[in-house]
Amino acid sequence: MTTPHATPRATTEGTVYTVTGGDWDEVVESAVKSDDERIIVNMGPQHPSTHGVLRLILEIDGETVTEARCGIGYLHTGIEKNLEFRNWTQGTTFVTRMDYLTPFFNETAYCLGVEKLLGIEDQIPDRATVLRVLLMELNRLSSHLVCIATGGMELGATTIMIYGFRDRELVLDLFELFTGLRMNHAFVRPGGLAQDLPPGAVDRLREFIKTMKKNLPEYDKLATGNPIFKARMQDVGYLDLTGCMALGATGPVLRSAGLPHDLRKSDPYCGYETYDFEVPTADTCDSYGRFLIRLEEMRQSLRIIEQCIDRLEPGPVMVADKKIAWPAQLALGPDGLGNSLDHIRNIMGTSMEALIHHFKLVTEGFRVPPGQVYTAVESPKGELGVHVVSDGGTRPYRVHFRDPSFTNLQAMAAMCEGGQVADVIVAVASIDPVMGGVDR
């Protein structure tokens, strides 16, 4: 039976039924038939392949993804709000926990903003600046190793996963030697660093560089020389330069589309313009290109670390201004705040005024002139920006972060729609989102 009252009309939004009466059963039956294969699938937020508590809502037609959306917010910790209730130095202990795989980038971006407001950018000791670069490049290595290891694990390449975490452990051992902690260091402070490198640190660094140079070619053999790995990555998660620019994607996602945009070159900070290194790019616009870029960036990071070691001259690691500087020249105490017994004995033996000043500096903090600044660093995932606003007090009025994981995750839909369900995992892994940074 046919009826002129219910005629389906195909549009870009789907099939539209114009009904003016007649057989409703036929309308329903026709609609059900047209949407027979349409299924909504929730991938996550506890899915092992979504890099944390990320929820992906997928509309699939058979094996093809017709629509993809992100659900975020499951790891919201209120870090930006908490910063408004702590002094400027205490802020580093919060920001280091955002993207927990790149703590030194979070800390450095925040401290560069605070230093810009204070007007002390030119007063930061050279040794502190070189050590910041050194720590950031080590951190870039460890972040890329996790990305490659977890990406390999999700594809079933468990050997890459084991190798990646093996090498990352070497970096975390160095962090533990330098800062006392494997993660969440709060080592970069406004004005410099919490303390200097311990004895023997440079020798350990040289050993690490030698080991990593030996280990990096293994990833080439396991991945780039593996036809199954390449077939699984090539032409998957495709996003061209136009799409990257429209969605604000940065980092390896943007560079895989052929644009050599890297803030270390285009808008240098911490003296990066004086270092010799290349910005790797690809023209594949896919997950495989992003993988190759991260592999090459690790080699470039080793180059920069070697240059940092050559530039390490003896000197202070904190500004000379005692109204800002926390004690950095003495060993840290058990509380991790620079209040070692040596320091307490030193200031108590000097004068009561020095003791009062130290007490006020730690409890109340220093004042930052009113104003607002935006600073950005090139994190392993892309542009990590921070907008810092001061009202002239001892606490931030507002601190907002532009996290690259959050921005790049918007590209997930463009990468996945029209592809296979299995390729969603590869596309998300190539973005390398960390939910601590996305949700903050």
Curated annotation (Swiss-Prot):
Taxonomic superkingdom: Bacteria
EC code: 7.1.1.-
MF terms (GO), sorted A to Z: NAD binding; NADH:ubiquinone reductase (non-electrogenic) activity; quinone binding
Catalyzed chemical reaction(s): a quinone + NADH + 5 H(+)(in) = a quinol + NAD(+) + 4 H(+)(out)
One GO CC annotation: plasma membrane
Enzyme class: translocase
Pfam families: Complex1_49kDa (PF00346)
Keyword Transmembrane helix recorded: no
Topology term for the membrane: Peripheral membrane protein
Subcellular location: Cell membrane
InterPro entries hit by this protein: NADH_Q_OxRdtase_suD, NADH_UbQ_OxRdtase_49kDa_CS, NDH1_su_D/H, NiFe-Hase_large
Sorted UniProt keywords: Cell membrane, Membrane, NAD, Quinone, Translocase, Transport
Family membership: Belongs to the complex I 49 kDa subunit family.
Subunit details: NDH-1 is composed of 14 different subunits. Subunits NuoB, C, D, E, F, and G constitute the peripheral sector of the complex.
Entry function: NDH-1 shuttles electrons from NADH, via FMN and iron-sulfur (Fe-S) centers, to quinones in the respiratory chain. The immediate electron acceptor for the enzyme in this species is believed to be a menaquinone. Couples the redox reaction to proton translocation (for every two electrons transferred, four hydrogen ions are translocated across the cytoplasmic membrane), and thus conserves the redox energy in a proton gradient.
Protein name (database record): NADH-quinone oxidoreductase subunit D 1
Annotated organism of origin: Streptomyces griseus subsp. griseus (strain JCM 4626 / CBS 651.72 / NBRC 13350 / KCC S-0626 / ISP 5235)
Lineage of the species this protein comes from: Bacteria, Bacillati, Actinomycetota, Actinomycetes, Kitasatosporales
Gene, per the UniProt record: nuoD1
